[in-house]
Amino acid sequence: MTRSSIELGDVTPHNIKQLKKLNTVVFPVSYNDKFYVDVLEAGELAKLAYYNDIVVGAVCCRIDNTENQRRLYIMTLGCLSPYRRLGIGTVMFEHIMNFAEKDGNFDSIFLHVQINNNGAIEFYKKFGFEIVDTKEQYYKRIEPADAHVLQKTLRRTAPNSNSTATSTTANSNSRSKARQFTFV
């Protein structure tokens, strides 16, 4: 399989049922109607992954403005098991990284992973994520109920490291355009 056979598409009212079905198959938790309403409004932060015009995966994220930080939260990123290890997850993750890079104002990207999901943990570690916390009893109605919090810290640097004037400009549009974005 080549990456050219993998395409990402928008989540729309016409295909939201495919996302619901996919999530039911891929994830051990069920998502409520509000989740899907939010996904429909997420734009570039929610994508279906197609392989030969068949929905085989999806990624859904949201912006989290808590803990005095602006972070990107990966709510779901999953692929049907027959299509795993073919680069589909990587394409979805790279889409999210590109979004974060273009935005230029995220402190980190984070997500929760069930503590026994070694495949997912290794997938994210491959992209520089680290386990930063473990939440006991995070999940309801599934075992194990504990979840690791995985995080990738993002660092923004001004083009001229000898001057901080660029990063303190009052106009946020010029500020974000003036920064270079690097991943730690």
Swiss-Prot record:
SUPFAM superfamilies in UniProt: Acyl-CoA N-acyltransferases (Nat)
Result when mutating residue 124 to F: Abolishes N-alpha-acetyltransferase activity; impaired sister chromatid cohesion during mitosis
Enzyme Commission number: 2.3.1.258, 2.3.1.-
Residues that, per the record, bind CoA: 117-126
Ranges for region Disordered: 157-176
Annotated PROSITE patterns: GNAT
Key words, A-Z: Acetylation, Acyltransferase, Cell cycle, Cytoplasm, Transferase
Subcellular location: Cytoplasm
UniProt-annotated binding residues for acetyl-CoA: 77-90
The protein's assembly and partners: Component of an acetyltransferase complex, at least composed of san, Ard1 and Nat1.
Record-stated family: Belongs to the acetyltransferase family.
Name of the protein this chain belongs to: Probable N-acetyltransferase san
Gene for this chain: san
